[in-house]
């Protein structure tokens, strides 16, 4: 069943332009599902939500959930500004994390020093994982603000 969910998410996220992008989006989706204690279908609903969730983002967030996506976009941008990542790799970077599900889910992203010395772009991997973890936790914390009327929101109205 787990394999099916991962495969289904990869297919659903096939808008991504490379295998690495799909892998990164699947990783992010797994964090969202774990920390939010939600299923695969609910996890996919964030794509295209409001003005900032999904590809692109502009205007003013429609609610706290959408604000999580704006903060996520800004976090990726900050990783680039700080020289940790190249802009072309933010959505294609795969990373490692530890997950504990005893009780409720908790995620600990690997820090730069946790990676083997031969692994390239460790600072980027650590930064992107932390951006994804924070966004997933933000989604979980703000799940009560999630409003179905903002699904597949017309971004040109933002």
From Swiss-Prot:
Summary of the function given for this chain in its UniProt record: Starfish phospholipase A2 (PLA2) that has hemorrhagic and capillary permeability-increasing activities and hence is considered to be deeply involved in the local inflammation. Shows hemolytic activity only in the presence of phosphatidylcholine (PC). PLA2 catalyzes the calcium-dependent hydrolysis of the 2-acyl groups in 3-sn-phosphoglycerides.
Tissue: Expressed by the venom gland.
Molecular function per GO: calcium ion binding; calcium-dependent phospholipase A2 activity; phospholipid binding; toxin activity
EC code(s) of this entry: 3.1.1.4
Needed cofactors: Ca(2+)
Identification of the protein by name: Phospholipase A2 AP-PLA2-II
Proregion residues excised on maturation: 17-23
Native source organism of the sequence: Acanthaster planci
GO process terms (BP): arachidonate secretion; killing of cells of another organism; lipid catabolic process; phospholipid metabolic process
Family: Belongs to the phospholipase A2 family. Group I subfamily.
């Amino acid at each position: 069943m787990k394999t099916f969910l991962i495969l289904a998410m990869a297919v659903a996220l096939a808008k991504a332009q490379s295998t690495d992008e799909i892998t990164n989006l699947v990783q992010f989706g797994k964090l969202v599902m774990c920390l939010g204690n939600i299923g695969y279908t609910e996890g996919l609903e964030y794509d295209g939500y409001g003005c900032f969730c999904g590809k692109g983002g502009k205007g003013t967030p429609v609610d706290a959930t959408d604000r999580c996506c704006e903060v996520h976009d800004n976090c990726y941008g900050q990783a680039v500004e700080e020289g940790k990542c190249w802009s072309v790799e933010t959505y294609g970077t795969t990373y490692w994390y530890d997950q504990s599900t005893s009780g409720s889910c908790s995620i600990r992203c690997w820090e730069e020093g946790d990676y083997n010395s031969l692994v390239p772009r460790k600072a980027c991997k650590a930064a992107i994982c932390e951006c994804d973890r924070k966004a997933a936790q933000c989604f979980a914390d703000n799940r009560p603000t999630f409003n179905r009327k903002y699904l597949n929101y017309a971004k040109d109205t933002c």
